[in-house]
Amino acid sequence: MRSVAVVPAAGSAERFGGKKLLATIDGEPLLDRTIAALLAGGVDQIIVVVAPEAVELQHDVNAFTDARVWTVVNPDPSRGMFSSLQAGMAEAQGDALVVLPADMPFVQGATVRLLLETFAQKAAIVSPRFNGKRGHPVILPPSLRDEIRAADPSLTLHDILKRHQDQRVDVAVDDQGVVRDVDRPEDLPGR
């Protein structure tokens, strides 16, 4: 099974007040931690979707010097995160499509691995649940790729997934990172 992750990273980070994905946690950029969790979880390829002007972010991704990690540019990120997901899905060719927003650096690699293992057994839409709350990453079957690409960019992934409730499988995890993102500087540890 070939897994491909799409990591939307083209947002403006207005609530954070600047370059959120390059902010550090224990000396490591937030985006790098998100990518590292996906690699540790066994994802085969990672597509990071960036804004056209995000040169520093592109350099950060390119610093991985890992052919499994590369960028795609969302030509109009002002249309929202779903448009970044669509841009990434246009390039994603895999049996399991992993969606993890870039601002979720607390997800554990073991959680990603567990979700992929569950997907391999059930080939459904697989989501983690922490304390009863659904989170990310979400694993999608390739059958949803074209539906996502063709959808109106004003929609959300949640809108698409609501159409497929009968295909959803939730996995209880002991990983708060699946429901913890970074929106403001105070969301980072030690601040």
Give the residues covered by each predicted segment.
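Nucleotide and nucleotide-moiety/phosphate-recognizing core
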Residues: 2-134, 166-173
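Residues that scaffold the ATP/ADP-binding catalytic core of kinase and kinase-like folds
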Residues: 15, 95, 147-148, 190-191
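Residue-level recognition of oxygen-bearing side chains
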Residues: 21, 30, 111, 143, ...
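Short beta-strand-to-turn element immediately C-terminal to the catalytic PLP-Schiff-base lysine
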Residues: 23-25, 139-141, 181-183
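Short beta-strand and adjoining strand-loop segment in the mid-core
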Residues: 86-88, 143-148
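Conserved nucleotide-sugar donor-binding
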Residues: 94, 135-146, 185
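Short, well-structured alpha-helical patches and their helix-loop capping segments
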Residues: 107, 132, 136, 140, ...
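Conserved alpha/beta core of the MobA/IspD/sugar-nucleotide pyrophosphorylase nucleotidyltransferase superfamily
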Residues: 150-191
